[in-house]
Amino acid sequence: LSGNEEASLLKFFNYKEFVDSESLLVDVGGGSTELYLCDKNEEKLKSFNLGAVRILKGLDKEKNWQELSNFLANINSEQIQNIIGIGGNARQIIQAAGVLKDSLNLEELQEIRSRLGKLSLEEKISDYNFPSDRADIIEHATNIFEYILLCFENAKFFASNWNISDGYIFKKNAEISQATSLEVS
């Protein structure tokens, strides 16, 4: 799937618990970051060539960060109350915060990033039970979420159990349902 196709799958995310507040959905993957905002007036979605593995390998470029910054600047900062992280990186960040946390403010996210930055790969695995394929990139994923949260300082960061693959399944089910209803009529 292309990055924009991945971003479009975020619209299938069911976020009933956040229905009364504006939310920005963010999926930080290894090679890209997808954002989706749907408010009463418009839908915005975009994929950026910024991912945790790209940063780890030094492949992130200033122009990619600038594209993300420009996209975020076109969203009313007072409007967003929730940054909902999609996927494993977001869940691992919340896990690092502790058992009783379900959301983080900017200061808490920055503290976690700082703490993770001081740990070796082995310590991240043993202390936080991070999978080995996630332990080396989690700090970089946290950097991306922090960058976004800096634009929406009043927002809280949440992690969802949902993944992009769930969006793909919901999309396919919707297509099948639509095709079936057309056959019946």
Language model segments and positions:
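Helical "lid/coupling" subdomains associated with nucleotide-phosphate turnover
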Residues: 1-22, 36-185
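Conserved SAM-binding loop
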Residues: 25
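Active-site-adjacent helix-turn-beta-strand microarchitecture at beta-sheet edges
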Residues: 28-32
